[in-house]
Regions:
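Predominantly extracellular/secreted and cell-surface proteins with exposed
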Residues: 26-28, 32-105
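Aromatic (Trp/Tyr/Phe) and Gly/Pro-enriched flexible surface segments
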Residues: 130-265, 269, 283-294, 298-331, ...
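Short, solvent-exposed loop/hinge segments that bridge or flank secondary-structure elements
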Residues: 14-40, 91-94, 151-182
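Edge beta-strand at a domain terminus
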Residues: 6-14, 24-28, 60-72, 105, ...
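Beta-rich interaction/scaffold domains
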Residues: 378-465
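C-terminal outer-membrane/trafficking sorting elements
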Residues: 462-515
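Beta-sheet ligand-binding and adhesion/scaffold domains
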Residues: 76-133, 227-239
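Extended, low-complexity, turn-rich repeat/linker tracts enriched in Gly/Pro/Ser/Thr and Asp/Glu
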Residues: 50-52, 274-284, 296-299
Length: 515
């Protein structure tokens, strides 16, 4: 997808059209203009397609006054209204057409769904522009390609394995050519017909550890690329999974060694079945990680004495115990707070799964079966806060994601400036309206799939249904005691490339390298 930036942004990308169940795929342009009032205008000009050989010249779809809601990373555009579609062959029938539009503006990327109801033609047209990118491609491990590793000494000496499309292991690794060949010669990835209970798919992935005599090679898969650079498996400066969106290398399937993700999921779910080849009490666990980052170079694990400042959030479980012959679904929550100080924006995610949480410490024949990995996006209500003129903060009692309506008596005037709804979705979009003693909160999940509406009935008087808390400014005091340059100068935030010393409120000190 490309965007031309000026007074407006024009995006070129795939356009999927569904007309009463019949589909058409083509490429088109959509233009997004920001209005002076902060709303947006969407233009899909000269919209036409061929339906069963019959040309359909619909016309110009121009949607004005589309409200935008930010989640701090991206913008949601959402509106439901009637519009006139002009410039086509059916202007007289399309003077007032109901449309339901929801979309997301990302950094150089746009995605939207537009439902167009043409009642006079008895047609419902569903238009999808762009790519959703809220889930990983081939996360069910249904399709595979052949990965090949070649001896650096003899181009005719090769080994192959089945790697899941969009995923990678040792045969497609970077690093020392000789070590890549040694690590990749014996396959560790296998397509498998043993699927998790209730799956609609036919395949899963099996990872298998291999005894290389000098060390155990853990069965490992990643959305990025493996690097094999040292005989010592635990040398994280040389052996790691990595991704970098500026890298143009492609795998045997023609895909890059990175996964795009602009969103902020709340958890990663994955079905696993884990069996050790030989019981190992000191190193008994498999591992699964997902690290959201800004798309610049990132290694997992990080090199020694390095802290990455391009991380947005992570989901990590390094204690996946044996499940025997049983499939088990794991839910691994994402955490974001520890990385907020870096101010990075989500563009990519590096997901890695391995038969052992410790490099080279597994046993020969460890098996990790993987199926149906997904990201979870919440859209529930977690809290409602109201702030008095003196800074005292109140929370509405009993708020939870299931209860949709609340009532509170408040001893001060409630406005849009002192009323806030907090979602249980990290990247959820929250829009608030407040009029005539009723506040309405519409919460949409970051993947745009779920919307919940909550209401708060507000009365003026002595406090009822609310609880006073501490002053908001005190509650939000920084957890970091100080950030210093290597020269000892204190700074407010890590903004420029360089080495920093970070001291937390408990006196702990760490070095942080911003590239």
């Amino acid at each position: 997808m490309t965007a031309l930036t000026g007074m407006a942004d024009t995006y070129n990308g795939p356009l999927h059209i569904d007309i009463n169940g019949t589909t058409v795929d083509q490429t088109s342009d959509i233009t997004i203009e920001k209005q002076a009032d902060g709303n947006y205008t969407l233009k899909l000009m000269k919209f036409k397609f061929s339906l069963k050989g019959v040309p359909m010249n619909v016309g110009n779809i121009i949607i004005t006054d589309v409200p935008a809601v930010s989640n701090g990373q991206t913008l949601m555009l959402k509106v439901k209204k009637n519009i006139a579609i002009k410039g086509g062959s059916m202007d007289l029938m399309l003077k007032s057409v109901p449309i339901d539009m929801i979309g997301e503006l990302r950094d150089g990327d746009f995605y939207t769904n537009i439902d167009i109801i043409m009642e006079k033609l008895n047609q419902k047209i569903k238009v999808t522009f762009g790519t959703a990118k809220y889930q990983l491609p081939n996360a069910g491990f249904e399709t595979y390609h052949t990965a090949t590793v070649t001896s650096p000494d003899d181009p005719n000496e090769k080994s192959t394995s089945d790697e899941p499309d969009y995923w990678h292991s040792f045969m497609s690794a970077s690093g020392n050519p000789g070590l890549v060949y040694m690590a990749g010669y014996n396959p560790v990835t296998f397509k498998c017909d043993d699927v998790r209970p209730g799956s609609t798919g036919k395949q899963s992935l099996m990872l298998k550890s291999i005894d290389m005599y000098i060390a155990i090679a853990n069965g490992t898969i990643t959305t990025g690329r493996m690097n094999t650079g040292d005989f010592t498996a635990s040398n994280t400066d040389a052996n790691y999974a990595w991704s970098d969106m500026s890298n143009t290398d492609k795998d045997a399937h023609g895909d890059p060694f990175y996964a795009t993700l602009y969103s902020l999921p709340d958890a990663m779910k994955v079905w696993l079945k884990f069996k050790q080849g030989t019981a190992n009490a000191e190193h008994p666990y498999a591992t699964a990680t997902a690290i959201i980052n800004d798309g610049t170079e990132f290694h997992e694990p990080a090199p020694s004495e390095t802290t990455y400042t391009n991380v947005v959030g992570e989901a990590r479980n390094a204690k996946i115990a044996e499940t025997g012959d049983e499939w088990k679904e794991f839910t691994i929550p994402f955490t974001y707070d520890a990385f907020a100080q870096y101010g990075a924006k989500a563009k990519s995610v590096l997901v890695t799964l391995s038969t052992n949480a410790d490099a080279g410490k597994g046993s020969d024949g460890d098996l990790l079966y993987v199926d149906d990995l997904s990201f979870v996006y919440n859209a529930g209500l977690k809290a409602i806060t109201l702030t008095a003129e003196n800074g005292e903060m109140f929370t509405v009692d009993g708020v939870n994601s299931e209860t949709k309506e609340y009532t509170a008596t408040v001893p001060f005037d409630v406005t849009a400036n002192n009323l806030k709804a907090i979602s249980d979705g990290k990247g959820a979009y929250v829009s608030t309206t407040n009029a005539d003693g009723k506040a309405t909160f519409e919460i949409t999940s970051n993947d745009l799939a779920t919307t919940n509406v909550y209401t708060l009935n507000i009365k003026k008087g002595n406090a009822q249904g609310i609880t006073s808390g501490i002053n908001g400014a005190q509650a939000a005091q920084a957890q970091t005691a100080g950030i210093y340059t290597i020269d000892g100068m204190r700074v407010n935030a890590i903004t420029k490339p360089g080495l920093y010393i970070v001291k937390d409120a408990n006196g702990n000190v760490k070095k942080v390298l911003k590239k």
